[in-house]
C-alpha cells in the first residue's frame, strides 16, 4: 500500500495541536528501511515503488523541521540530510529531461534508462507533484554552495524544469483532462482523464497542480525579495508595504518587466535570478527606468543579481533572458538526446493515428496508452554527431516558440524539415521528446538491430492475453496477489517474487489462451509446482536459450484452452525450500 505520507500527516497534527505525542507517532511511522541508507548517502531505491517513497521523505523533512529544538531527540540534522540526499539522487541520477521519474511507477536502475525509452508507462505525474513539494521545503532553508547568503539555486532550476515540462504538460488544454503516465517512448502518446470515468491519484494531485503556478515565483527573507520564476503575476508583499507586477511572455519572449506599483519609503533588495541556462552575460542586461544597471553579473552557475535601493511607485526593472538551444543526453549516457530552449523541453509530433483510449474509460488500466506502439526504427533518428545536431535546430520567426531541424533525419520527413515546439503545447498527438542519435557509420547496424528487437517484441505483445510482473506493486494489486511465506526482490534490475509457502494471482483472460510463459533464472527452472484453478500443470515446458543475464522462458502448451474470464495461477515449492524466483507471468493466445 502507498502509506508514505502518514509520517508527514502526524507531524502536521503535532504542529497544529502543539502536542508532541503526534510528533513521536510521526517518527515511529517513518520507514527506517528507506531512511537509514539515505542518512549514509546510499541510494537503495532501485525496484521500489517511487511515489510511496517520495512522501516518506517529505515526512522526514517535516519531522526534522519540527524537531530542531527538541533536546530529547537529536536526529533532526541527519533526517534533513537524508531528505536532501534523496532529492539529489532522484533529480540528478533518476530523472529525465521533463523532471519526471520512474517506469511503471517504480524506480528503475539509475544507470539504465532502457525501460524509460521502451515502455509506455513513463514518469507518473504524482511523483513530480511530490518532488515539487519536497523541493519547496528544501529550498526554504538551503544555502548556495558558492554564496552562503543566497538559497541554493539547484532547487529552483529543478522546480522550473519540472513545472514547465511535466506539470504544465499534464493537462489537456481543451477538455481539461489530467495525465497519469507521460511516456518517454518515442512515437507514443498520453491518455487524459475524464470527469465521469477517472478518479486516479494523478487526478487528485492534478487538481492541485494547476492551482499552484504562483507559489514559487517569489520568496522573501527579511527585507529581501527573490524573483525565482518568470511568470506573469502580481505580488502583494504586505510585510514590507510593496506591490509588484511582473509582465512577460516567457518562454515565447525573452523580455521580463517588473513594475513597482506601491512602495514604502525604505531600502529593499530585489534578488533577480540568473538561471544556469542563461549561459553567459551577453544579452542579460538590466535597466531600471530605462537606465542600464551596472552590476557584477555571475554567469555559468545559477545565482541572483541583487539590486538594493529605496524603491518608489512606478519604478520599472527590465531585463532579457538569453535563451539558447541545448542538447541533453539521457542520464545513462545512451545515444538518446532531447532538445531544450532555455529550460523548455522541445518535442515533435509523430502523428495522430491510432490514439486508442486517449480519453480514458473506467477500466482498471484506462490510464495507460494501450494503442499501437510505433516501432522505434520508424520514429525520427538524427544522423550526425551531437554538436552538429544541436546546430541544426533553428528558431522560427513568430509569436509562439517553434523550431525547424534541417539536419539529416531518418526516416525522411514528409515536410522538408522536422518541426519542434514546447512539449507542454503538444497534445492529442503522438510525439518524440528523446531522439536516437547515430553517426553515419552506426546508422545501418542500429536500424537492423532495432528492427529485429521491435519485431520480436511486437509479435510477443500481439499474442499476449495477460501479463504480470511479480514483485511490482501495481501489477500484483491488479491481479489480486495472495501469498503465504513469500518475499519480493530484484535481480539484474528485474523484480521477482518467490515463496517458501505459496503465492497466487488471478489471471485476466480477455480471449482464449493456449500457452503460459514463465520467466525465471536458469538455475531456478525446476523449483516450482504450478496450479491453474487448483489443477496441477503437468505438461513439460519448452525452454528458451538463456539470455546474457541468465534468464530463461518456460513455455507451457496448456492441455485445454483457458476460456474468457479469470483463472487462479498458484506457485508453490517443488520439493525445494523456495519456489523459483518468478520474474514474469505471461498468458498467450
Name the predicted role of every residue range.
Residues 292-314, 320-334, 483-515, 519-589:
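Beta-strand-rich ligand-recognition modules
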Residues 31-35, 88-92:
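Amphipathic alpha-helical segments of tetratricopeptide repeats
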Residues 265-288, 516-518:
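Beta-strand-rich binding/interaction modules
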Amino acid at each position: 500500500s502507498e502509506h508514505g505520507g502518514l509520517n508527514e500527516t502526524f507531524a502536521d497534527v503535532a504542529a497544529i495541536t502543539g502536542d508532541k505525542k503526534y510528533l513521536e507517532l510521526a517518527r515511529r511511522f517513518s520507514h527506517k528501511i528507506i531512511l537509514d541508507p539515505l542518512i549514509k548517502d546510499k541510494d537503495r531505491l532501485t525496484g521500489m515503488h517511487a511515489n510511496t517513497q517520495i512522501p516518506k521523505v517529505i515526512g522526514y523533512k517535516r519531522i526534522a523541521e519540527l524537531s530542531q529544538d527538541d533536546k530529547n531527540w537529536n536526529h533532526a540534522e541527519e533526517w534533513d540530510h537524508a531528505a536532501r540526499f534523496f532529492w539529489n539522487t532522484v533529480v540528478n541520477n533518476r530523472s529525465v529531461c521533463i523532471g519526471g521519474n520512474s517506469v511503471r511507477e517504480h524506480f528503475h536502475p539509475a544507470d539504465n534508462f532502457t525501460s524509460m525509452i521502451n515502455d509506455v508507462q513513463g514518469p507518473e505525474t504524482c511523483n513530480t507533484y511530490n518532488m515539487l513539494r519536497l523541493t519547496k521545503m528544501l529550498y526554504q532553508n538551503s544555502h548556495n554552495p558558492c554564496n552562503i547568503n543566497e538559497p541554493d539555486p539547484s532547487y529552483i532550476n529543478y522546480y522550473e524544469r519540472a513545472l514547465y515540462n511535466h506539470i504544465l504538460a499534464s493537462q489537456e488544454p481543451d477538455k481539461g483532462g489530467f495525465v497519469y503516465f507521460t511516456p518517454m517512448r518515442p512515437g507514443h502518446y498520453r491518455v487524459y482523464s475524464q470527469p465521469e470515468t477517472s478518479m486516479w491519484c494523478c487526478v487528485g494531485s492534478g487538481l492541485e497542480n494547476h492551482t499552484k503556478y504562483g507559489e514559487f515565483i517569489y520568496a522573501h527573507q527579511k527585507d529581501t525579495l527573490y524573483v525565482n520564476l518568470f511568470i506573469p503575476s502580481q505580488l502583494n508583499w504586505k510585510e514590507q508595504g510593496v506591490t509588484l507586477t511582473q509582465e512577460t511572455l516567457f518562454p515565447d519572449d525573452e523580455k521580463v518587466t517588473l513594475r513597482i506599483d506601491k512602495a514604502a519609503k525604505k531600502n529593499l533588495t530585489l534578488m533577480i535570478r540568473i538561471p544556469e541556462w542563461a549561459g553567459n552575460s551577453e544579452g542579460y542586461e538590466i535597466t531600471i527606468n530605462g537606465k542600464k544597471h551596472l552590476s557584477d553579473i555571475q554567469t555559468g552557475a545559477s545565482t541572483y543579481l541583487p539590486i538594493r535601493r529605496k524603491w518608489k511607485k512606478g519604478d520599472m526593472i527590465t531585463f532579457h533572458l538569453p535563451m539558447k538551444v541545448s542538447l541533453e543526453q539521457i542520464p545513462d549516457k545512451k545515444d538518446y538526446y532531447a532538445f531544450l530552449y532555455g529550460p523548455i523541453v522541445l518535442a515533435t509530433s509523430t502523428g495522430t493515428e491510432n490514439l486508442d483510449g486517449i480519453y480514458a474509460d473506467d477500466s482498471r488500466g484506462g490510464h495507460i496508452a494501450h494503442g499501437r506502439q510505433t516501432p522505434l526504427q520508424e520514429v525520427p533518428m538524427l544522423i550526425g554527431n551531437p554538436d552538429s545536431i544541436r546546430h541544426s535546430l533553428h528558431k522560427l520567426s513568430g509569436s509562439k516558440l517553434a523550431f525547424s531541424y534541417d539536419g539529416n533525419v531518418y526516416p525522411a520527413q514528409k515536410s522538408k524539415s522536422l518541426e519542434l515546439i514546447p512539449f507542454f503545447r503538444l497534445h492529442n498527438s503522438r510525439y518524440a521528446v528523446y531522439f536516437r542519435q547515430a553517426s553515419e557509420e552506426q546508422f545501418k547496424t542500429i536500424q537492423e538491430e532495432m528492427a529485429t528487437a521491435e519485431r520480436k517484441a511486437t509479435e510477443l505483445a500481439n499474442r499476449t492475453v495477460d501479463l504480470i510482473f511479480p514483485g511490482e506493486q501495481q501489477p500484483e494489486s491488479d491481479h489480486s496477489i495472495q501469498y503465504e511465506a513469500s518475499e519480493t526482490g530484484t535481480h539484474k534490475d528485474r523484480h521477482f517474487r518467490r515463496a517458501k509457502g505459496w503465492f497466487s494471482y488471478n489471471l485476466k483472460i480477455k480471449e482464449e489462451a493456449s500457452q503460459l510463459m514463465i520467466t525465471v533464472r536458469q538455475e531456478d527452472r525446476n523449483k516450482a509446482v504450478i496450479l491453474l484453478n487448483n489443477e496441477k500443470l503437468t505438461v513439460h515446458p519448452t525452454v528458451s536459450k538463456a539470455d546474457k543475464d541468465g534468464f530463461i522462458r518456460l513455455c507451457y502448451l496448456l492441455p485445454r484452452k483457458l476460456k474468457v474470464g479469470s483463472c487462479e495461477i498458484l506457485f508453490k515449492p517443488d520439493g525445494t525450500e523456495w519456489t523459483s524466483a518468478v520474474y514474469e507471468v505471461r498468458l498467450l493466445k
